Amino acid sequence: NESRRNADLMIIPESFSCIQKIVKLLKSTDTPYMIMGNGSNLIFRDEGYKGVIIKFGKPLSDIEVQDDIIVAMAGASLAEVANKALEHSLTGLEFASGIPGSVGGAVYMNAGAYDGEMGQVVIETLCLDSNGELVILRGDEHNFSYRHSRIQDDDLTCLQVKMKLQKGEKNKIQSKMNELNARRREKQPLNYPSAGSIFKRPPGSYAGMLVD
């Protein structure tokens, strides 16, 4: 995303406890703030953001694999998580290999493509509420639906995600990822800046045809 704007201040925290302290401080001083991941699905006003942006960066991007479970911090690249799944012959995240953005943002909006979405694999999230307190959501507590989750409704920030995948064959997983990425290149102008999708694809058709 190359649609860049300025903010009064940007903070890249190094730990979850650091985020908690920052949020509590900003709340106590009534300072406007927003928390963002990679910014892949955001558009700012021309004048930028009048407040503090807390950005998930490299310190909060760790990815761990435990058998068929992947635990990823919210700042991790979704594409990197998909590649980590491939590396360990885990299937279920092929759809995510070409989706830009962070894991936290993807879970927040239940990102998906090609009949796959985050709600199909997420089993637990560690979140931060608007008062700087930790909240854990499990299973159906996420209330996932099309591009929606309880994380939006409750004004939560996703800090860490636990995903359950299935053991598969690496060559088949790679083949599926290659196929989906080829379809993206064929239909989407990936060489241009983008603020994300706008239209929902109707059953049996696709948004581009209707717009045309």
Regions from the language model: what does each represent?
Residues N1, I63, L93, V107-M109, ...:
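Short clusters of hydrophobic/aromatic residues that line enzyme substrate/ligand-binding pockets
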Residues S3-V103:
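Anion-binding (especially nucleotide phosphate/pyrophosphate-binding) glycine-rich loop
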Residues N41-L42, A82-A85, L93-S97, N110-E117, ...:
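A generic local secondary-structure boundary/capping motif
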Residues E2, V71-M73, E94, Y108, ...:
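Conserved beta-strand segments that form the floor/walls of ligand-binding pockets within enzyme
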Residues L42, L128-D212:
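Phosphate/pyrophosphate- and phosphate-bearing ligand-binding catalytic cores of soluble enzymes
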Residues L78, A82, A96, P100, ...:
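Hydrophobic, well-ordered secondary-structure segments
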Residues I19, A74, L78, M118, ...:
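Generic structural signal for well-ordered, non-membrane alpha-helical segments
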Residues I11-F16, I43-S61, Y108-R138, D153-Q160:
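Structural signature of FAD isoalloxazine-binding scaffolds in flavoprotein oxidoreductases
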